[in-house]
Amino acid sequence: KVIIRKSKLSAMSTPAANNMTNTPINKEPRIAPDTQAPRDQAWQQDLAKAITGAEQGLLDLQHADGYWCFELEADCTIPAEYIMMMHFMDDIDTGLQSKLAKYIRSKQQSEGGWPLYLYGKFDMSCSVKAYYALKLAGDDPEAAHMRKARELILQHGGAARSNVFKRLALAMFQQIPWRGVPYLPAEIMLLPRWFPFHLTKVSYWTRTVVVPLTILYSLKAKAANPQQVNVRELFTLDPDKERNYFPVRSRLNWLFLMIERAARHLEWAVPRRIRDKAIKRAHDWFVERLNGDDGLGAIFPAMVNAHEALALLGYDKDHELSKTTKRALEKLLVDRGDMAYCQPCVSPVWDTALASAALLETGDERTRTHLKSACDWLVERQLTDEAGDWRDIKPDVPGGGWAFQFANPYYPDLDDTGVVGWVMHDLDSDAYKDSINKAARWISGLQSKDGGFAAFDADNTHYVLN
């Protein structure tokens, strides 16, 4: 995410950063002409003009509270999922749906598909979701753009070749049988820590996405789908006759598939009281982490699963939890007037840290007030005593990290924390000494046994689960 200057790494290397001294902002520009390069005066003037323009551009975009937060645009999977969520819930905002659909159409490539990134290659899962969302929004399947998309999807093997998350959505919309998706029973919530699979052994985003998903799987969720829109035309073989939803890629993969198949065949034997206990534990786990209007894990996939799981568990749309999950999803929307899209999350802490680091590099004393405002805003968002999943492995380490988003207390990360600490140290290490020391202690405390550092948890090296 960022190029690390070695001088800053050495400054932050002590666990408590006790010997940091005041390092006022450098008044001399850090970008100087290379004496070995041609002395092109026009080039130097253009460079200086670009730096000045970028500096002013950042200052103009700083929020009054001190932070920066830019749009976080992703691929069309997320706006497509937003449309599908509205049809799953039978809670359709037709105006918003029209704007989302227009955005999705605007991103379709000339050959008919949708990529995962700008100018990327065709992606099956993204294209299937985009096609389904457009059909739900009312696009005629015989329209030119829909025909092109459908033909390309079929050329690549059809919707059965989608990834597991897309197939889960297809199962919930009753387009494929549930045997076409991974076995995700809520009983995984009851597994002991020593078991090969445990929530602490997967990434935070996997936890927050999968836990509500186990409820959707266990109760075999069915989308309301009020217009009963289907996409059977995207399959090369009747989905009920398809036998190759899980192609074997390796011996280890084959072993996992055999274990999963055996467990699936024994699902009927799970006592109802065990299933109910597991669903309740999954419910309690994600409700505890709902995170208010900032949402579960502060990421869209987890938030939408939580919203749908609450509905499946019988929560009325006017229940406070349901209203909270809906508001969290709505906060991710970006409305551009005639079209709209949904962000995967927001990034104010990261944007503020990087913008501040860039402004520090200019050496311009005029930015000090802006940088102090940014660092003061960051101080208020440092996570110290809050509960967090990272404490499962390191319960005795004092808090001191920052999360990526406005609020995500369960999931601070080491890369945001490191960059924020460097920025504070560069600006005024005396003024921000307390925050810097807390950050350094937290980073040091989350070092893994093998010597490395991960983003969210120590010792999360269970690579076989990949």
What is each residue range found by the language model?
Residues 1-3:
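Short, low-complexity, intrinsically disordered N-terminal modules
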